[in-house]
Amino acid sequence: MFDKEYVFYGKHADMVRKMTAKLSDEIGRGFFGTNYEIYQVAPFVGWIYKRRAAVDKNGETTKIFPDKMMKGKQDLVFNYRNIMALHFGDKSTEEIMHIAFGLDYKDQDRKEYDEIYDSYVLGGVEEMYEQIFEKNGANSVDEYIRNLYEFIEELNMRLYGTWDDLS
């Protein structure tokens, strides 16, 4: 589990590359520094927005190398367990515990659940990309940054409600 490279394919690879690409000469990096950073955040964005997507094997690829996956394994397993618990929240506690905690070393038994997790990763990639680069017809760095700000504000509202609710 999370001990080999992860590959983004096709349109998702293109989206990940754009989110990690240098925004401009003045801004020497992208919204995300690495593919791994996107992989950490994407499943939760997918869950929050109820967005899942299938693998698109057409086109180019971009990867997260095995050493990076293994270094972050503890965090990735934590993410996986949370997404499984959220996705299967209508099941019994025993079933959730089995799915989220009982299949770590049973790759074949876990395969269908890995595919569910991956669908949230890819759905989250799509949602982040669309929110940042496509919303409001954005076509400049300033507009992308504004969209990112609005996206973060919207995430906050989806998670916590209004600012008044926080006090």
Question: Where on the chain are the PLM-derived regions?
Answer:
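Short, basic amphipathic alpha-helical segments that act as recognition/interaction helices
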Residues: 31-57
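Charged, low-complexity intrinsically disordered terminal regions and linker tails
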Residues: 1-26, 52-167
